[in-house]
Amino acid sequence: MTTTGSNSNHNHHESNNNNNNPSTRSWGTAVSGQSVSTSGSMGSPSSRSEQTITVVTSTSDTTFQRLNNLDIQGDDAGSQGASGVKKKKRGQRAAGPDKTGRGLRQFSMKVCEKVESKGRTTYNEVADELVAEFALPNNDGTSPDQQQYDEKNIRRRVYDALNVLMAMDIISKDKKEIQWRGLPRTSLSDIEELKNERLSLRNRIEKKTAYSQELEEQYVGLQNLIQRNEHLYSSGNAPSGGVALPFILVQTRPHATVEVEISEDMQLVHFDFNSTPFELHDDNFVLKTMKFCDQPPQQPNGRNNSQLVCHNFTPENPNKGPSTGPTPQLDMYETHLQSQQHQQHSQLQIIPMPETNNVTSSADTAPVKSPSLPGIMNSSMKPEN
């Protein structure tokens, strides 16, 4: 009787509060029903009523929390209990380890073995076999939900394993058909092939580096030649002739018999040295011999290279033999193709330096000394493959 009176008074108090504040949610009916249903549960009626009064007088958030903690029976209690059991079961599945003790790595190995043994297969075929192999039997007391969950887990892992193997190019997939390609292997022949490829690439890099350096030297030589010619013309010592670029220089012994045939269109030249050793040089070689490529071109406000070094290129008379001094001088036979007899000063030319008062005779002027080189023709601005 005391418990009932407490609940009725409390319900009456709640109804008055609800009339005064319509926006407040009423829990009188629900609490009344709960107090009656819980009168036969564990604990004394007085303690249960005190717990109910505490729930109602708290705030809304506390009310939800404490109502969920009540031991509720009946239809509502059954539905909430089933929901709680379901959530608990899901939590155990997510947190607990795999009953089969198989991870993605083990499944990947199994999938790899299956596909390798079959050669050609499908996803469903591999998944069905692994489900039959790893799924728990029905006589161990496993629920159908657990078996369905395990089957889905196995199929998902098979799908992930196939994607990994496909990314590694171990298997290939054409629509639904999966084909085995093979595991990657590295043999001694592969290592040797990689070494040879590396050596070939290094050689190509070295050749391109040497070619780039040669082009830079040729550019420096041409710039210095242009500055030297401009200085000569501006000083009023313009020479009467020169050698136009590009050209080829033929070098052989002084007493050798050389037969030269030139086509009418001046595009083809045939040399017959009669088994005499010879060397072919291009204009870049001559620029290097004249020291044009040693120094970078000077700025317009700086000193000209021709003021520092006297570049003199005088082809030796083929009728004269080599000098008998300690350092032998090479005789040069020159052949070049010119379309005009008189060249303008803007065109690249190798112009001999005019004689000054300090030079008494042309015999005192030493010819160009060139090192002994093999018989190779180096064309200017040759393309690099």
From Swiss-Prot:
Intracellular or extracellular location(s): Nucleus; Cytoplasm
UniProt region (Disordered), positions on chain: 1-53, 71-102, 296-385
One annotated Gene Ontology cellular component of this protein: nucleus
Motif extent (DEF box): 150-184
Family matches, as SUPFAM superfamilies: E2F-DP heterodimerization region, Winged helix' DNA-binding domain
Posttranslational mods: Phosphorylated.
A GO molecular-function descriptor: DNA binding
InterPro entries listed in its UniProt record: E2F-DP_heterodim, E2F_WHTH_DNA-bd_dom, TF_DP_C_sf, Transc_factor_DP_C, Transcrpt_fac_DP, WH-like_DNA-bd_sf, WH_DNA-bd_sf
Record remark on domains: The DIM domain (182-263) is required for heterodimerization.
PANTHER family for the chain: TRANSCRIPTION FACTOR DP (PTHR12548:SF9)
Role according to the record: Involved in the regulation of the G1/S transition. Increases the DNA binding activity of E2F proteins after heterodimerization. The complex DPB/E2FC restricts cell division and lateral root initiation and may function as a negative regulator of E2F-regulated genes. The interaction with SKP2A is controlled by auxin.
UniProt name for this protein: Transcription factor-like protein DPB
Organism: Arabidopsis thaliana (Mouse-ear cress)
Gene name of this polypeptide: DPB
